[in-house]
Design a protein with these regions (language model features):
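Beta-strand-connecting loops/turns
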Residues: 112-113, 267
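AMP-binding/adenylate-forming
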Residues: 90-103, 114-174
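Short hydrophobic/aromatic-rich motifs at helix boundaries and adjacent loops
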Residues: 44-46, 72-74, 102-105, 124-126, ...
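Hydrophobic alpha-helical segments that mediate membrane insertion or helix-helix packing
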Residues: 76-77, 135
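Nucleotide 5′-phosphate-binding alpha/beta core
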Residues: 1-75, 81-98, 102-106, 111-112, ...
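Active-site glycine/GP-rich loop and adjacent strand/helix microenvironment
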Residues: 1-16, 138-416
Length: 416
């Protein structure tokens, strides 16, 4: 879909929010914006950005329908702040199903596949429900196992022969380790591919990062990366080429901007900005996600012509200034994932007495040797030019810290 073909959906969106959104009514009034003057996608630059702070401060003012019409109540994960509520109508839930169905097909899926869901479908988590509905819409099967529980995961794989796993990729090495420890021939299993959610598996040049290499060096499966958020209610999913997540232009208008808010060029890094199309409950205009990605506009070798996003390099709010060096958490994760002895870790970011960032990596107690600490110091220095502090706790305590029951995702990163 070209910008011209997105225009009718954009016009419907502008009319919808101007009539029903208290937040955008106020913004249009304060900025003297005439929505009738915004006739093309290019005209969107006349509108101010919507930020995470706006959503948090005026949450329910974004709602465009009575709450009696809401089918599903969800919240963001609240990684950096309190969770923000999102309200989905029946139409919005169907839009989610359409998105995931098309995303699965982009990742080589079909109605003959059986998906095993290794993430939660409850806890107000939009994506878990979306995956199930997408598989149903496509005509595929799904086994809803949920997060963790390696025994149940393998029992389900052996019993039902799923072909695709949907999981946070850092869980997969644990799954492999469990199989090895329990004499499960995972290489001969029915699994052909893994849809990796929530964490990058590629470097900006599209090569596999250390986590991706760790998985594929042990298990001959195809990895597909995805990028999504509750706010956009849609996903950028890789195709077989593995050259970035494809935009679904029926569901989103994409901008990628620099620090001044101007569009970046082909292949450049910028902040992802989305305008949601076809959303009834809580549509968003020019929403700044805070996520930094490279953008690609050239047609993909798979034949799709929609823009693609590279892996998330970092989040603007998660940028760490440590000993004069700017670091994003994925760079720390990549170093840790390169060390085969490390199967659990947590990165803790804090402020010292002078207000400067400090980084501490928490690791299992059995790794606490002088040789290991020296190896890690050298590795961090060579890869990042700086070395964080290391601290050690029991594996039981670290597992408890990372896999908290009330959390929807592993807490690999903590700010205190």
């Amino acid at each position: 879909m070209s910008p011209e073909t997105q225009q009718p959906a954009l016009q419907q969106l502008l009319t919808h929010v101007s009539l029903h959104s208290k937040y955008y009514q106020r913004i249009f009034r304060e900025h003297n914006i005439d929505v009738d003057a915004i006739s093309t996608v290019a005209d969107l630059v006349q509108l101010p950005f919507t930020t995470k702070d706006d959503l948090a401060q005026y949450n329910d003012d974004f709602l465009c329908v009575p709450k009696s019409r809401i089918t599903d109540f969800v919240t963001t994960s609240g990684t950096l702040s309190d969770p923000v509520a999102f309200y989905l109508t029946d139409s919005d839930v169907e839009r989610l199903a359409t998105n995931e169905s098309e995303s699965f097909r982009c990742a080589g899926g079909s109605e003959s596949d059986i998906y095993q869901l290794m993430t939660t479908i409850d806890r107000r988590f939009m994506a878990g429900l979306a995956y199930w509905m997408g598989a149903r819409k496509m005509g595929a099967g799904m086994i809803r196992v949920g997060p963790g529980a390696p025994f149940l995961q393998w029992e389900s794989i052996q019993r039902f022969s799923p072909t695709v796993i949907i999981a946070i990729p850092s869980f997969i090495p644990r799954l492999i380790d469990y199989a090895i420890a329990n004499d499960i021939d995972f290489a001969a299993s029915s699994i052909k591919s893994i849809i990796c959610i929530g964490e990058p598996i590629r470097n900006p040049d599209f090569s596999l990062n250390e986590l991706g290499k760790r998985i594929t060096s042990q298990w001959d499966v195809k990895l597909y990366s995805t990028y999504a958020s509750t706010e956009m209610g849609a996903a950028f999913t890789e195709c077989r080429e593995g050259k970035g997540g494809h935009l679904n232009p029926d569901l989103l208008i994409l901008e990628v901007v620099d620090d001044e808010g101007h569009a970046v060029e082909e292949g450049e890094l910028g902040e992802v900005v989305v305008t949601t199309l076809g959303v009834e409950g809580m549509p968003l205009l020019r929403y700044k996600t805070g996520d930094l990605c490279n953008v690609y506009y050239e047609p993909c070798a798979c034949g799709r012509t929609s823009p693609r996003l590279g892996p998330v390099v970092g989040r603007k709010q998660q940028m760490i200034k440590f000993k004069g060096t700017t670091i994003f958490p994925p760079a720390l994760f990549d170093v840790l994932d390169a060390v085969k002895e490390i199967d659990l870790y947590q990165v803790v970011v804090s402020k010292n007495e002078f207000g400067n960032d400090e980084i501490t990596v928490v690791l299992p107690m059995q790794l606490q040797t002088s040789a290991f600490k020296e190896t890690m110091h050298s590795l961090f220095k060579s890869r990042l030019r700086v070395s964080p502090a290391l601290t050690f706790v029991t594996a039981k305590e670290l597992t408890f810290r990372i896999y908290k029951q009330e959390k929807r995702k592993p807490e690999k990163l903590v700010y205190i």
